[in-house]
Amino acid sequence: MTVPLKRIDKIRWEIPKFDKRMRVPGRVYADDVLLEKMKSDRTLEQAANVAMLPGIYKYSIVMPDGHQGYGFPIGGVAAFDVNEGVISPGGIGYDINCLAPGSKVLTEHGYWLKVEELPEKFKLQGVKVYNLDEGHNDTSNVAFVAEREVETGEMAVRVTTESGRIIEGSEDHPVLTPEGYVYLGNLKEGNLVIVYPFEGVEYEERKGVILDEDAFKDEDPQVLSFLREKGLVPLRWDDPRIGTIARILGFAFGDGYLGEMGGRLTLTFYGKEETLRELKKDLERLGISANLYVRESIETTSGHSEGKSLSIELRVTSRSFALFLEKLGMPRGKKTEKAYRVPGWILEAPLWVKRNFLAGLFAADGSIVEFKGNTPLPINLTQSKSDELAENLVEFLGDVAKLLAEFGIETTLYEVKSKKGVTYRLSIVGEDSIRTFVERINYEYDPEKKVKGLIAAAYLKLKERIVKEAHEAVKDDFPTFEEFAKERGYEGGFVAEKVVKVERVKPEYTKFYDIGVYHEAHNFIANGIVVHNCGVRLIRTNLTEKDVRPRIKQLVDTLFKNVPSGVGSQGRVRLHWTQIDDVLVDGAKWAVDNGYGWEEDLERLEEGGRMEGADPDAVSQRAKQRGAPQLGSLGSGNHFLEVQVVDKIFDPEVAKVYGLFEGQVVVMVHTGSRGLGHQVASDYLRIMERAIRKYRIPWPDRELVSVPFQSEEGQRYFSAMKAAANFAWANRQMITHWVRESFQEVFRQDPEDLGMSIVYDVAHNIGKVEEHEVDGKKVKVIVHRKGATRAFPPGHEAIPKIYRDVGQPVLIPGSMGTASYVLAGTEGAMKETFGSTCHGAGRVLSRKAATRQYRGDRIRQELLNRGIYVRAASMRVVAEEAPGAYKNVDNVVKVVSEAGIAKLVARMRPIGVAKG
């Protein structure tokens, strides 16, 4: 999209309401150089999209450090009426990590779609997920599909497992391992990843009607009325439930009975309780109720005697649904005494529909996969009929054999002895055919058969690859199936596979894709592999560069030791996820109450380090589980601890109030709510995606999901966001405590004697309810600041009393090795930008692009030559955060200063950096 721009002055630009959906114009703060970068991505388009949201006031604003984000631009500000407006997680902070096009996403019906096909079809699809908490596979509807451009020169990561599975995506796409999620780019040869061995078949679209209303013209009108109400008639090939119907029918051909019971046509299923409970879920998806009964076993409809034991039956009392299945080919009466064939519509169906029918049939009457050592035994489908129907039985099993042959599965058919009637057995024989069956068809409903079949699929795929590569049979030390299942198998049929190759490859495509799911597991299965808030604080000292320079290496190394950092880093405090509710409610106060800081610290934090109204119950268990071990840790990427020297004072009067002087050593901390905050955003994106149609909110961009602020979903998200913000303040408070301890360790003085007070702490990914003036009237708004900082002017009651006469301190971190700034809030910001200004330098290169252009060891040496000592968890992070990967922060602060939306107070240059 080409976004028109109108120049207002040297550093202000307007995006006119060029699209009739825009409710307000856009306002961009940038010089010519900064604007060119915004034009190179979707920053301006995203700003225009934000201007379309209900309840927005004045402008959709982009700060000079703005760049493309998720939904909202990073560096974006928007204020919405608290009664008529919306709230959006994308406007507060969220990122996407992506897969290559062509990645096969497995759906609930056992077929796969390429990830890039999902935007058109996702409303109808349920995808397979791995329920981490319960340890089994599950199904979830898709919440959203995201895409982003492959950046110029960006490399993808291609990972190959020992069985030959390949996944390709961006370096930061998370993949599940036995130890948790790991970025694709961080995987190494020999690592284990979690795979779902089922491969399924490709989706095939089919149009037309399978069963129309004429089929019921001779039935009671109530039957047709019921089936219409359930959306089952007319039944079309493109009905998203057709796979469900096919597998129910398949199971019914095995362990189902359609017949009169008490003078009423009834449908009954027999089997193990856990099997019938799974079947019951599918019936309920169709809107059909069924009841489980425990009864004394009698001879079943298939003719097998079970003796006098208890059996379970699942009974559907809906006559309409029983007739529905009959019209689809289900025989009425005792199947051993009825002639029937596989229904014609199944024989004509796309392969994925046939797969569902067969998976249901084999769940009922097929044998479980068994092994002798490392060799699979035949999988058998055995059925019986009365003697006079022997030919029909052979024909029926012949139909099944033809279906299997379409998958490349070979079978043999033979008669077996039986005391009553005639019995035939259809056997899947040969290792290749057995592997194909468990990989592409498998079993539905019966958990025991299904799980064993999945692990068998992984085992046989690995065995096949080893045989092909070695050109000989597997050796004696190759594990038996039982050994493999015990060592590599997980509940739900998931398996751990070893990574054998990790490559950086040049993408032969232009876009990456990702999907979000509603399920709390927040993952999906691609190519068989399970895949998946912030702020700044400034601490002053009474030390000068002359005091610190001789000990800078020791100081930074001590900070690196005492403050946990890096991808997935965990804090020094061990809290179980059930124990962090107090942290989510009390924020920095919790930390101070528990000995991490001083009471006076709370007076120098935005919101006092605690937002009122945080509700820990609005935060998911998964978010708490991610956050608990990370409390008190820095993280990675652009998060840092930096020892800085104040090298220039622009406003001596304000600097004096802030406690800053030239030559002074200060410490800047940049980190946030870690995995907890990201999970909160993920959770509510999915919730809001579900709700957005209910509220009929315009949806100009699939990433720009929002709900009315006053809605139940909006208020619940706001409460969860507050909890995440409180977690972030507690996190920075604990880090502050360890920074003070580190200075004490190096300089042998108490932190109090070193004057280690907090200057201020600001959030820059947050939503706030504030009062602002619009068109001469005071209005309450929910201000979204995504990569933007609050900048309130002198006299504002939200500013700490010690700073109220001069305005709120605004902390602007630069990139690694460049200057950072302290600014002060202004009246200009209140009038133009809802009391907001920029938040940092803003990236010009993605992390991936930076690692291609820079080498971490060289950057570190260059910085050392300039007197800046860097200690990092990896050289890759140093390359990602190279100064050249960011905009010139001097230009950014110059723009906001010239615009009058912040006032320059002081500049700091780094002398030591600790990074994750």
From Swiss-Prot:
Pfam hit, one: Intein_splicing
Cited SMART domains: HintC, HintN
Keyword annotations: Autocatalytic cleavage, DNA-binding, Endonuclease, GTP-binding, Hydrolase, Intron homing, Ligase, Manganese, Metal-binding, Nuclease, Nucleotide-binding, Protein splicing, tRNA processing
GO terms (BP aspect): intein-mediated protein splicing; intron homing; tRNA processing
Cross-referenced SUPFAM superfamilies: Hedgehog/intein (Hint) domain, Homing endonucleases, Hypothetical protein PH1602
MF terms (GO), sorted A to Z: DNA binding; endonuclease activity; GTP binding; metal ion binding; RNA ligase (ATP) activity; RNA ligase (GTP) activity
UniProt catalytic activity: a 3'-end 3'-phospho-ribonucleotide-RNA + a 5'-end dephospho-ribonucleoside-RNA + GTP = a ribonucleotidyl-ribonucleotide-RNA + GMP + diphosphate; a 3'-end 2',3'-cyclophospho-ribonucleotide-RNA + a 5'-end dephospho-ribonucleoside-RNA + GTP + H2O = a ribonucleotidyl-ribonucleotide-RNA + GMP + diphosphate + H(+)
EC number(s) from the headed UniProt entry: 6.5.1.8, 3.1.-.-
InterPro entries hit by this protein: Hint_dom_C, Hint_dom_N, Hint_dom_sf, Homing_endonucl, INTEIN, Intein_C, Intein_endonuc_central, Intein_N
Cofactor: how and how many bound: Binds 2 manganese ions per subunit.
Domain DOD-type homing endonuclease: 248-409
Chain residues that bind GMP: 638-642, 764-765, 813-816, 820, 839-842, 915
Family per similarity comment: Belongs to the RtcB family.
Oligomer and partners: Monomer.
Misc. comment: Ligation proceeds through 3 nucleotidyl transfer steps, with 2',3'-cyclic phosphate termini being hydrolyzed to 3'-P termini in a step that precedes 3'-P activation with GMP. In the first nucleotidyl transfer step, RtcB reacts with GTP to form a covalent RtcB-histidine-GMP intermediate with release of PPi; in the second step, the GMP moiety is transferred to the RNA 3'-P; in the third step, the 5'-OH from the opposite RNA strand attacks the activated 3'-P to form a 3',5'-phosphodiester bond and release GMP.
Protein name: tRNA-splicing ligase RtcB
Organism: Pyrococcus abyssi (strain GE5 / Orsay)
